Amino acid sequence: MYETPLTGLVLSGGGARAAYQVGVLRAIARLRRERLGPRRARLKSPFGIIVGTSAGAINAAALACHADRFDASVEVLSRVWQDFRAEQVYRADSLGVIRSGAQWLTMLSVGWLIARWRKARPRSLLDNGPLAELLNTMVPLERLPMMLQQRQLHALAVTASSYTGGEHVTFSWEVPAGTAA
């Protein structure tokens, strides 16, 4: 059991909401600096438990992976959302659209005949490789176990939904059992 109560942060989905969330987080960071002083406020996140869904899950995971540097993580999120463009999510250039279109056309015209195409069919209309690159930069998941082990963070949960199947899946991480306080 924890001696002091934990504060949780729940971040909902939606791109516009995720950008709004970062504005609120910036205000929280500013208020902490005013109250605690700039040196102490830059440290550990005020949120011991962070939960997010969809675009809010991206913000949640980024905050969790940098739970030891709250101000810095908020600034990273702020820079991403202030300059956010469609090109950061999918390739909309001519070559990217042609390549993706060719994959779909091949799969739809003859792919059903070839077993390898049935298994390796395109997953999206446009190439979302840029989003994967952005997430790898924003969310260094290799830091998450350390944040939990050091108790910079007590738990993270992110929820994802399938557009095609409609199912929801929640992934969660928490402080390992038996970890000293």
Where do the model's predicted regions map?
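Glycine-rich, flexible loop/turn motifs
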Residues: W104, R121-P122, P140, G165-E167
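Active-site gating loop/helix substructures
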Residues: A132, Q149-A181
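Patatin-like phospholipase
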Residues: Y2-G8, A16-G129, E133-L135, S172-A181
